Amino acid sequence: MQIKDKVFIVTGGASGLGEGTARMLAAEGGKVVIADMQVEKGETVAKDIGGAFVKCDVSNEADGQAVVAQATSMGKLMGLVNCAGIAPAEKTVGKNGPHKLDVYTKTIMVNLVGSFNMIRLAADAMCKNEPEGTGERGVMISTASVAAYDGQIGQAAYAASKGGIVGMTLPIARDLSRNGIRNMTIAPGIFGTPMLMGMPQEVQDALAAMVPFPSRLGKPEDYAKLVKHIIENDMLNGEVIRLDGAIRMAPK
């Protein structure tokens, strides 16, 4: 699939991995819809790249439908990149008692249910596409994490949500294969996202030193490059790719 003139939805596109992806898609000639809860940032990025912005809680059905409607109004919706997510840290039993159930539930709702909500709605629209010459009608790319495999202390909720994304990658790809729609997942390691970049420099340096090679924090551009390759390589389907510089996380 070629990116030029196709429409892509990027959830969490107002910052971090999502913003890097949105900018790459626009630079390659794609039409981009940014779906995010950060209105001011989202509108700024959308204006900057000539795209559209829709305020969206990815776990909300009506919000997701509004995003897909905006995308299909702009042309042929051929791609969804799920980057929206939250990462609260809380132990199963901490100093103040057991893990708050509402925090656990919200993490699952945003990261896992939100990703599936956007996949199912975008896929429904893509099924109506006239197929490309290869028979392809679209591609889904979701964001898991190395925490799905190497969850650290305090990451029970986050690791569960990302593990769920890993677990549904293949069955969704199989579900959608008859429609010519691919489904892939990227599991990033330690990346220089806004949340991490807010930490003290010495903490950032220590985290970067944990990465075998290259010994640095991942950049949104690194993630966007892999998204581009997945879009363009139609043999990539039903798989999770770790993008982590060979890191394996310690317990804490």
State what each model feature region is.
Residues I3-V33:
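Canonical Rossmann dinucleotide-binding motif of NAD(H)/NADP(H)-dependent dehydrogenases/reductases
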Residues D124, A173-D175:
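Alpha-helical segment proximal to the catalytic Tyr-Lys
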Residues D150, K228, E232-K252:
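Short C-terminal tail/terminal secondary-structure segment
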Residues S145:
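Residue(s) in the substrate-gating loop at a strand-loop-helix junction
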Residues I119, S161, T169:
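Active-site helix of classical SDR
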Residues V211-Y223:
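A conserved structural motif in NAD(P)-dependent oxidoreductases
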Residues K76, I86-T105, D124, K128-T134, ...:
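Conserved mid-core segment of classical short-chain dehydrogenase/reductases
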Residues M78, I86, G97-I119, M140-I141, ...:
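Catalytic Tyr-X3-Lys loop
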